[in-house]
Design a protein with these regions (language model features):
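Conserved ABC transporter NBD signature motif
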Residues: 77-88, 325-334
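Catalytic Walker B motif of ABC-type/P-loop ATPase nucleotide-binding domains
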Residues: 180-183, 409-412
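A short, surface-exposed alpha-helical micro-motif characterized by mixed small hydrophobic
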Residues: 222-224, 450-452
Length: 483
């Protein structure tokens, strides 16, 4: 792909001294909110930067980025100026927005709309009225740049999470935006897929001259590519003077918090010779899976996107049934937190969400308020769940499940989109659940979390468990899967 022309956008002069992003005096409040998200925020990002945007869960990172993209900007009261390459965002039509600003969401499922990779690549170009010849040229060129040509005719729903996120990036860049905004783009990727995605993003920045801004809670893997970083806190943005300061490894729990009770623990669930596939014409996702999980412990499952982790959790939750083999859970109650917490959120307010199962599960409002406070949700009870940040929705969904007290707690990527403080809250909650005799099984790409919080770590590969060991033994000899 040719280097994007930094000198102009749609024929409008745009010198290198013009910032890629310029925000002046931005104030913004969601409808019905008691306090604004931003109050007089100023922010400037130079052209050609690979910039990181860090900050706590709910600090406004996603809100700030989405306000720069008119088509997805949230409703609310707004004041101040937002400019991209010198043009006011409020004056951009759909074409101008597409040519200036590309946006990649945290979850590729929220972005991919077409059945095949080729059609997904062409979808945005079709909507802009690009000629068929130009469309084919751009799809071909972008596919070669990202190495998509071997799976160009695959169905999008057959792709791994890593490939879906790479496809989302490629489809956006086929529109040739000058500024690329990404919201937690690697939070659902395994370590190898994350490295591949970040390398592709680095090439976009360096080889194509595209300004890249990544909102993230996990900046450490990106520091080798970043040219600058900004922290959002208290409704304001400030530049991080020392990039290396973002690379430290933080403790999640006290050193003795993961000590299990002595003695043999009773079994909570097991799968024996489990085979499962989603379609008779498709390949097996689980292939003779043998695994057992004990009560009173936190079990972490790691492995590449598409290796079968989520499927195994669905089998344990009885939302999927093995075609061969047995799943043994006895009378133990179970609850599953899926990758997308929105699947559990149906009410109009946080309070109503927490009280949804109160009558059937036997807890009162005092218990709900206590759980909300424990998970950092006490000040959000009047908010609509969909007005929360992705991390706050994750905490809310977990709070709902903890209120019903399942003996088997199943979690699919429980820490995605969470800052250090929120990860600590979840770590403590999972250890407390295990200490009370519950079993926790979590599929995760957060290796630091797995090492510090779990009693054992299993690697899933090709539908089976390749190994299961205590964290100290599991991580010692790994090359790619290292905490």
């Amino acid at each position: 792909m040719a280097r994007f022309d930094r000198g102009s956008v749609s024929g409008v002069a745009c010198g290198l001294d013009v910032p890629a992003i310029e925000v002046r005096g931005l104030s913004f409040a969601y409808p019905g909110a008691t306090a604004p998200v931003f109050d007089g925020l100023d922010w400037t990002v130079p052209q050609g930067a690979f910039a990181l945007l860090v900050g706590g869960t709910g600090s406004g990172k996603s809100t700030l980025l989405s306000l720069l993209k008119p088509e997805i900007a949230p409703a609310g009261e707004r004041a101040g100026e937002l400019r991209v390459l010198g043009e006011d965002v409020a004056d951009m039509d759909v074409r101008a927005s597409a040519e200036r600003v590309g946006y990649v969401f945290q979850d590729p499922e929220n972005q991919i709309v077409c059945e095949t990779v080729w059609h997904e690549m062409a979808f945005g170009l079709e909507n802009l009225g690009v000629s068929r010849d130009e469309m084919r040229r751009r799809v071909a060129e972008t596919s070669y740049f990202f190495g998509l040509e071997d799976w160009l005719h695959r169905d999008t729903d057959t792709l791994s999470g890593g490939r879906k996120q790479l496809l989302s990036l490629a489809a956006v860049l086929a529109l040739r935006p000058r500024v690329l905004l990404l919201d937690e783009p690697t939070s659902q990727l395994d370590p190898v897929a994350e490295k591949n995605f970040l390398h592709a993003l680095f090439r976009v920045n360096r080889e194509l001259g595209c300004t890249v801004v990544v909102a993230t809670h996990q900046p450490r893997p990106m520091l080798e590519y970043a040219t600058c970083a900004y922290r959002i806190e208290g409704g304001r943005v400030r530049e991080v003077a020392d990039l290396a300061s973002l690379g430290g490894r933080e403790e999640l729990l006290a050193s003795d918090a993961c000590q299990s009770a002595p003695g043999a623990a009773p079994g909570a669930a097991a799968i024996r010779e489990g085979w499962f596939r989603y379609d008779r014409a498709a390949g097996w996702v689980l292939r003779g899976l043998d695994v057992a999980f004990s009560a009173g412990a936190v079990h972490a499952i790691v492995g590449g996107n598409g290796c079968g982790k989520s499927t195994m959790l669905s089998v344990l939750a009885k939302t999927a049934k093995l075609q061969r083999g047995r799943m043994m859970r006895g009378a133990a109650s179970a609850a599953l937190l899926p990758q997308n917490p929105k699947a559990l959120l149906v009410a109009e307010t946080v309070r109503d969400e927490l009280m949804e199962w109160a009558s059937t599960c036997g807890y009162d409002e005092a218990a709900a308020q206590e759980q909300a406070a424990r998970l950092g949700l006490a000040s959000l009870e009047a908010r609509h769940p969909y007005d929360l940040s992705g991390g706050q929705r994750q905490l809310l969904a977990l709070a709902k499940l903890l209120l019903i007290g399942p003996e088997l707690l199943l979690l699919d990527e429980p820490t995605k989109g969470l800052d250090l403080a929120s990860r600590r809250i979840i770590a403590r909650a999972l250890r407390d659940h295990a200490k009370a005799g519950g079993a926790v099984v979590m599929a995760t790409h957060d290796l630091d979390f797995a090492e510090q919080v779990s009693d054992d770590v299993a690697m899933m590969f090709d539908g089976e468990i390749a190994c299961m060991e205590p964290p100290a033994d599991f991580f010692v000899d790994n090359v790619f899967y290292r905490a």
